[in-house]
Swiss-Prot record:
Family to which this protein belongs: Belongs to the SNF7 family.
InterPro entries assigned to the protein according to its UniProt record, in alphabetical order: Snf7_fam
Residue span of region Disordered: 1-21, 188-219
Parts forming coiled coils: 26-179
Start-end of Basic residues biased regions: 1-10
An annotated GO cellular component: kinetochore
Record-linked Gene3D superfamilies: 6.10.250.1710, ESAT-6-like
Protein name stated in the entry: Charged multivesicular body protein 5
Superkingdom of the organism of origin: Eukaryota
One Pfam family of this chain: Snf7
Post-translational modification note: ISGylated. Isgylation inhibits its interaction with VTA1.
Length: 219
């Protein structure tokens, strides 16, 4: 059937607000160009009128200038109307885009709430409390193990009063040791020989002095 009657053309999508705004702005720009050309004509006619004398010729130029000015006013009105249309469409487009953004935000929030509910279903408060209890028990067991490993064997019990008394006495002994240390140094010094050294003989029976040299008999 399509060979005889042809295939229906697909319908073009309706223009969006953005397309309409672009079309209206383009028309407004075209009108601005026309107004600029009319301004140039008005300047030319105004110069001619200044140079001309009163009479039919001057009146004719004035009529032309008035027609141009009337056209300018009409174009300006059309331009203002198009500018208002463009502004209204931009406001509507902004409102629509804001609503779309709001819907996207709401959808994202709904999805987030759904995911949160799903996550909460997988987390049980009882399980968390059981885990906390297990961790606490394990920490207590670990502390008991450390105490058992650090236990000392055969250590006699000491009286705190005796230890404090020994500590005080130990401080006095240390001070006494520091005060008498110079006496120990003096006692350890070599003794000074007393009197004159005695005469000694070598293996040959000859008298020698303290250096082992033969003594010279006194004359």
């Amino acid at each position: 059937m399509n060979r005889f009657f042809g295939k229906a053309k697909p319908k073009a999508p309706p223009p969006s607000l953005t397309d309409c705004i672009g079309t209206v702005d383009s028309r407004a720009e075209s009108i601005d160009k026309k107004i600029s050309r009319l301004d140039a004509e008005l300047v030319k006619y105004k110069d001619q009128i200044k140079k001309m004398r009163e009479g039919p010729a001057k009146n004719m130029v004035k009529q032309k200038a008035l027609r141009v000015l009337k056209q300018k006013r009409m174009y300006e009105q059309q331009r203002d109307n198009l500018a208002q249309q463009s502004f209204n469409m931009e406001q509507a487009n902004y409102t629509i885009q804001s609503l779309k953004d709001t819907k996207t935000t709401v959808d994202a929030m709904k999805l987030g709430v759904k995911e949160m509910k799903k996550a909460y279903k997988e987390v049980k408060i009882d399980q968390i409390e059981d885990l906390q209890d297990q961790l606490e028990d394990m920490m207590e067991d670990a502390n008991e193990i450390q105490e058992a490993l650090g236990r000392s064997y055969g250590t006699p019990e000491l009286d705190e009063d005796d230890l404090e008394a020994e500590l005080d006495a130990l401080g006095d002994e240390l001070l006494a040791d520091e005060d008498s240390s110079y006496l120990d140094e003096a006692a350890s010094a070599p003794a000074i020989p007393e009197g004159v050294p005695t005469d000694t003989k070598n293996k040959d029976g000859v008298l020698v002095d303290e250096f082992g040299l033969p003594q010279i008999p006194a004359s």
